[in-house]
Amino acid sequence: MINIAKEHKVNEQIRVRQIRLIGGEGEQIGIIDTRDAMNMAREKGLDLVMVSPQAVPPVCRLLDYGRFRYEQQQNEKENRKRVRSQEVKAIKFRVKIDDHDFKTKTGHVRRFLDDGHKVKVTIMFRGRERTHPELGERILVRVAEALADVGTPEGMPSMMGMDMNMIMAPKQAPAPKKERTEESAEKAGSAGETEPVPAASAAAEAPANV
């Protein structure tokens, strides 16, 4: 795979007389005049893009530059999203928290989990509250139960100073049963083996009608 830089010379921006050309399917065409390569690009409805300007002669490739840029931007967006998902967000609760505040803060945790973030849930103790860690544990249990559909606790709660902490991680959605069944069928077919599925088993695995 050729790594194309963000800034490239495209079509008429390519001023050299000869280039080494790579076709739209990655095939090596060889060293040809740039003018001939431009004509070839026009005939195929593609762009001539310089992918390796330091080579002698420079290497160019035939491709749909607009589509390539779109795919590159989508990949960059996914990479940024992946980096953001590695951030750990933090939401703090008090030991004495009313139902309204609990619901509001739990909603914040839910949004972070939905966005793919881990969340550190912190219970803050004041004064003598620290002598009753079970109060903080109860709140953390409530949080975990309220968010069981979108997240799971990582490890046990831990005390740090006057705070009790628990990390909630996003829950990965399981692959649909239909896809797993099709994948198994493909593997069995490629191996030249087919095994009968008992009727009871097939009925159990079939998704329920809603």
Swiss-Prot record:
Record flagged with keyword Phosphoprotein: no
Keyword field: Cytoplasm, Initiation factor, Protein biosynthesis
Subcellular location: Cytoplasm
Gene Ontology cellular-component terms listed: cytosol; membrane
Segments of skewed composition (Basic and acidic residues): 176-186
Biased composition (Low complexity): 187-210
Matching Gene3D superfamilies: Translation initiation factor 3 (IF-3), C-terminal domain, Translation initiation factor 3 (IF-3), N-terminal domain
Region of interest: Disordered: 169-210
UniProt keyword Cytoplasm, yes or no: yes
Xref: InterPro entries: T_IF-3_C_sf (IPR036788), T_IF-3_N_sf (IPR036787), Translation_initiation_fac3_CS (IPR019813), Translation_initiation_fac_3 (IPR001288), Translation_initiation_fac_3_C (IPR019815), Translation_initiation_fac_3_N (IPR019814)
PROSITE patterns: IF3 (PS00938)
GO annotation (BP), single: ribosome disassembly
GO molecular function, one term: translation initiation factor activity
Main location: cytoplasm
Family, per entry: Belongs to the IF-3 family.
Subunit structure: Monomer.
Function: IF-3 binds to the 30S ribosomal subunit and shifts the equilibrium between 70S ribosomes and their 50S and 30S subunits in favor of the free subunits, thus enhancing the availability of 30S subunits on which protein synthesis initiation begins.
HAMAP family: IF_3
Protein name (database record): Translation initiation factor IF-3
Species name: Deinococcus deserti (strain DSM 17065 / CIP 109153 / LMG 22923 / VCD115)
